[in-house]
Amino acid sequence: MDKTIYSKKIAESLSSGNHPEEFATLFVTLLRQLVMGRPVSREALGTALGWSGQRVATVLEPAPGTEYDEQGNIIGLGLTLRETPHVFEVDGRRLYTWCALDTLMFPALIGKTARVTSRCVATGRPITLTVAPEAVLQVEPAETMVSLLTPDASPDIRCSFCCHVHFFASPSVANAWASTHPGIELVPVENAFGLGHLIAHKLLEDSERNTA
């Protein structure tokens, strides 16, 4: 796997290839709002960005997986207030992520350390991590693996990518699962973190370029 090419594909898939630099700016800002543990209105997001409501809507529209509450506030896009198998605790606030890789890349985007609790998708064994912006500080079991898949052309990255990206308690368990799931690549947590770090920095670079 060429990590640079792969990270670029993931970053592009997040925005469905549309307005990639503007989307990166919106995405990073939205994550930093969601990590406060509250729904984010489009108005509040626009204020944080210094954008009009129409510009927010235009950039957000190509992301079909965006989650909203009954009042139309944003409650999830990668990082979510809705329960998933991946618990992502920051500053004592309990949030969730769509997939295993999110837990490894979001600390770099929000600039905070996260305590992650998940389970092996094959055995149900608990998996815990402490992930800082620059390193994985702790992982249990130590041999935890992550499954990866190259996203297809679908605009919905949650279905085309996130639903296939899991934690596994050991290489043997991961290999057994992958044998019945074509196209899957398995990597140790540290390698997955390195990939997530590249994706995060690509998004941060795009965001900074858009606001320069």
Swiss-Prot record:
Q: Which InterPro entries match?
A: MerB, MerB_HTH_dom, MerB_lyase_sf, WH_DNA-bd_sf
Q: Which GO terms describe its biological process?
A: response to mercury ion
Entry-linked NCBIfam families: lyase_MerB, PRK13239.1
Give the protein's recorded name: Alkylmercury lyase
Q: What does this protein do?
A: Cleaves the carbon-mercury bond of organomercurials such as phenylmercuric acetate. One product is Hg(2+), which is subsequently detoxified by the mercuric reductase.
The entry assigns this protein to a family as follows: Belongs to the MerB family.
The chemistry this enzyme catalyses reads: an alkylmercury + H(+) = an alkane + Hg(2+)
HAMAP family, alphabetically?
A: MerB (MF_00714)
E.C. number: 4.99.1.2
Please indicate which superkingdom the organism of origin belongs to: Bacteria
The record's listing under Pfam families reads: HTH_15, MerB
Instruction: Give, as one word, the top-level EC class.
Output: lyase
Keywords tagged on the record: Lyase, Mercuric resistance, Mercury, Transposable element
Keyword Lyase recorded: yes
Q: Which residues form the signal peptide?
A: none
A GO molecular function term, named singly, is: alkylmercury lyase activity
Q: Does the keyword Iron apply?
A: no
